[in-house]
Amino acid sequence: MITLCLSTLRGLHRAGGSRLQLTMTLGKELASPLQAMSSYTAAGRNVLRWDLSPEQIKTRTEQLIAQTKQVYDTVGTIALKEVTYENCLQVLADIEVTYIVERTMLDFPQHVSSDREVRAASTEADKKLSRFDIEMSMREDVFQRIVHLQETCDLEKIKPEARRYLEKSIKMGKRNGLHLSEHIRNEIKSMKKRMSELCIDFNKNLNEDDTSLVFSKAELGALPDDFIDSLEKTDEDKYKVTLKYPHYFPVMKKCCVPETRRKMEMAFHTRCKQENTAILQQLLPLRAQVAKLLGYNTHADFVLELNTAKSTSRVAAFLDDLSQKLKPLGEAEREFILSLKKKECEERGFEYDGKINAWDLHYYMTQTEELKYSVDQESLKEYFPIEVVTEGLLSIYQELLGLSFEQVPDAHVWNKSVSLYTVKDKATGEVLGQFYLDLYPREGKYNHAACFGLQPGCLLPDGSRMMSVAALVVNFSQPVAGRPSLLRHDEVRTYFHEFGHVMHQICAQTDFARFSGTNVETDFVEVPSQMLENWVWDVDSLRKLSKHYKDGHPITDELLEKLVASRLVNTGLLTLRQIVLSKVDQSLHTNATLDAASEYAKYCTEILGVAATPGTNMPATFGHLAGGYDGQYYGYLWSEVFSMDMFHSCFKKEGIMNPEVGMKYRNLILKPGGSLDGMDMLQNFLQREPNQKAFLMSRGLNGS
């Protein structure tokens, strides 16, 4: 997932932060004390600091706001007749870089710092800066000067990306209501500030949640010894199980005690229930009201205008059509799961209730995989120690994209477990950027998997290039005594996916910060990373990614073939669940009066055929609703149509490690960043219109 925390200017995502579609239009260079930082920025290096104290975060936030406001005031007072590209648009673009880099150091620590006070200060900084972003994005005086520039300058004399920057600035100004009356603008501004705070609080609540449950060893039946040994023990000789992914999913997939799974699923989907339900009850109507004031029927209509799908009707047709096509497959998978459950209940003496409960789904889908394909993920993970996976992943990406990675010794990082790498073009030696790897869970850390864009790759005022910097933030299991962190295959896939976002951040080479990295349409942003997931289903790639953690012996060819064949297991139910989440998201953003828990329960029954557990409220734990995917969660499935088309028509056809195809992908899909429309990039790569054939086949359906 891509996490966006500031506007269209930066990629921070998810799998967190509020993704505010605001256009920062800043003016001349900031004055001291930020000048020192600006001079480092001009050198194009990684200038990010992670040692700011809570007081420093507060002080620098106030300084950034005060000095940036002076810049806006200056731009807003330029006489209209004196407005030129150089003194308006170019100046605004130049200062964006300084603002983004400084803001990163202030608001990113909320997601990764080990210090609760630093996280709190960073969260407050994010709230203040988000309010400021809204205030400045609605400066009518600055907007008037940009409009005047478009009306008077010779657009043919400026580069295409600069024209796009100008057009997008005006488009975003109108989407912020700057063409409306002052009274309506003030209403919109006030509501946007409140929405921003609600989004930040929603995800902060999830990040800070530390709920845990206590079970006896018997209640954790069938879980492997290495998992149980990794758990914290209580004074009563029981085991503390958290709701973090490295604990939750192993229990849901392997624990043979239904009551334990029921308690875990209930707790997982009631996280932050009270506070986040209240937030959604405020946030959804606010979004609807803003959309109405701006002339849109619904919030979904508002956000989709900028996406490749364009309309709610196209999204609904896509989801409904896919749901119908998958219905027979889903029914067959449910019937098989029920047969497994009935058999196990008879063997273990459990009462058989004749239905699939929410806490049964992961457990019996895991059994399905083991029975149909003889793939035991618990045994398989012994071949995926994190050091081997990381080495193999980096090797594959380097070879495929013509890059070289070098770990930075004694790097300045926010936690001692974090590592930093420099990325260079293999042919020229040019430094393209850097990325951090933050792989393990800790208290207060962002609890999903995401790529955060920290420093934009773009041109600086002196014509040199600012290197792009990104962070891959995930939560794999911690190493324990005598055993490294071992990844399940689905975690290897997640690693590849998020690193695909990192490569998008690093390889994009744009002129403007606003178009750097993953700043593309939301329903296109997952395309590059999804496409790269295909490598973890390739036998040769899997050999590079695996080695038994004890003696280094490889996975057998037979097991590799079974693993690859298992790709289609449960694909009906897994895709139907994605459709459920997409439909819930669309519903809540087309009718803000709906009850989120009821809407989720309705679609679970109608589409998935597995009822939501009474008393839970999954949408209150659904970070995407407040993390930049509002009205746009469908984008995960929508973009997979494009990613599968690219993979099968080019990489599968020419060889998945073919360096020529890899460079074509790097140059035509990654390098443009957001400087081109997603559909234009796709057609440049495919040399035709995209189609659904490969996507449908990947779901076990007839491609025609």
Curated annotation (Swiss-Prot):
Active site: 498
Cofactor note: Binds 1 zinc ion per subunit.
EC nos: 3.4.24.16
Disulfide bonds: none
Keywords: Acetylation, Cytoplasm, Hydrolase, Metal-binding, Metalloprotease, Mitochondrion, Protease, Transit peptide, Zinc
GO cellular component: a single term: cytosol
Protein name: Neurolysin, mitochondrial
